[in-house]
Regions:
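Membrane-embedded alpha-helical segments of integral membrane proteins
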Residues: 133-174
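Boundary regions of SH3-family modules and the immediately adjacent low-complexity/disordered segments
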Residues: 95, 181-222, 226-235, 247-249, ...
Length: 281
């Protein structure tokens, strides 16, 4: 697994042993020239990630980006790889892509404190400040679902269910009135918590597979009131800037205009944006 890098304090921590400049040059040549792909051909995702770490530590952020992407392609999704890829994008000044990958890291592991800290750090640098468009209860629900990974919520549900079975056994087999009362009411509460944990576990799993959120990538993007380029000032909805997070609520393929997404921003404001100007998380 690639080691985690941090840019919270604008200074990266040490990573894996740095490859020699000659090795990095060979890797770069293999990536840039199809005829010379032997340096990276057949490498495992872990090896590619280690080479990416070395490139990052050598301040070769473009090569690090390419290697992290290849590591993801070969080895599959990883919260650490997305996190480190986000760092590589940040070092190139690509805040939009950095935010996308920090968000992806948190989708896979909501407990990734470094990714959360870096996401907050980069969000503080973008033009449009993030505004929660949901209600207080929506925020509480999202915070609860995102507290742990779906598997962790499933384990919590199993533990609670085991406690419920213990309370049920105490209620059935105990002859003491006080024990029966305590086990009945305690078991009822634990059963309700078990159901809640199961629901949250499914919601957390669905969140990982969901792609309803996206990030604006260009320095600025003019949103429209309809799924086409604004043809007059009245068709211009509002302007969003790189790094802004939007919620996709609809999509349409407009002949001659390409794919467009209807998005929700801020306090419930809706508008249409070109699909090519956002990247789904």
């Amino acid at each position: 697994m690639a080691s985690a890098l941090t840019i919270c304090a604008q200074t990266p921590d040490s990573v894996a042993t740095v490859a020699s400049p000659d090795t990095l040059n060979q890797v770069a040549d293999g990536l840039s020239s199809p005829a010379e792909e032997q340096p990276v051909a057949g490498l495992s995702g872990e090896t590619l990630a280690q080479q990416a770490d070395s490139a990052y530590t050598a301040d070769n952020f473009v090569l690090a980006e390419t290697l992290y992407l290849k590591a993801l392609e070969v080895g599959g999704s990883s919260t650490t790889l997305y996190y480190n890829l986000g760092n590589a994008y940040y070092r190139q000044g690509n805040l939009g892509k950095a935010i996308v990958n920090y968000e992806r890291a948190l989708k896979l592991d909501p407990t990734n404190a470094d990714a959360r800290a870096n996401l907050e750090f980069v969000n503080s640098k973008i033009t449009d400040k993030q505004i929660d468009s949901g209600s207080y209860m929506d925020s509480v629900w999202e915070g609860t679902v995102g507290m742990f990974h779906a598997d962790t919520w499933a384990v919590i549900a199993l533990v609670l269910f085991a406690i419920f079975l213990g309370a049920l056994a105490a209620y059935i087999f105990s002859s003491a009135v006080a024990v029966k009362k305590a086990s009945f009411f305690g078991g009822l509460i634990v059963f309700i918590l078990t159901v809640c944990a199961v629901i949250i576990s499914f919601a957390a799993a669905n969140r990982v597979n969901s792609d309803k959120y996206a990030i604006i990538l260009p320095p600025s993007s003019q949103l429209s009131t309809s799924p086409r380029e604004a043809r007059s000032q009245s068709e211009q909805a509002f302007l969003l800037h790189e790094g802004t997070k939007v919620e996709i609520i609809d999509s349409i393929a407009n002949p001659g205009e390409g794919m467009w997404y209807e998005v929700l921003v801020g306090h419930g404001e809706r508008a249409w944006v070109k699909a090519s100007e956002v990247e789904k998380i």
